[in-house]
Amino acid sequence: MYYHSTRSDSITATAAQGILQGLASDGGLFISPLTALDWEDLMDRDTFTMATKILSHLLPDVEHMDRLVEQAYRGKFETEDLTPLVPVGDRFVLELFRGPTSAFKDVALCMLPQLLTAAKTVKGMEEDILILTATSGDTGKAALVGFQ
């Protein structure tokens, strides 16, 4: 599967290339083509299985996604269900603050180091990756904790 830049269909990348490169050469984001996924099959699955199936679907050249999901999330969130859906009166609230820094960004930033490591393996890359952040909010802390 190839990802395309949001600014040009002619700029493409595999999942591993997109993860390592970050942005497309034209400054656009890499997006995947819309492909069918059996959403009904995910309805009664636990969070780890859902994450594994969705990420495997979107990133087919990354192997052992189940192991990456386990390493990213197991034991790092307050609840087994990473982002529990909690009834509040006649409505539901998705709790996105159960991660290590209590920021919604923990969901993505705990997975990012696993994906970077897997992408390096796919590309046969041995160089270290330098992550530089600057923030006035919770993003930097969430990124730092994700990489610890």
Label for each model-derived stretch:
Residues 1-148:
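PLP-dependent amino-acid enzyme catalytic core
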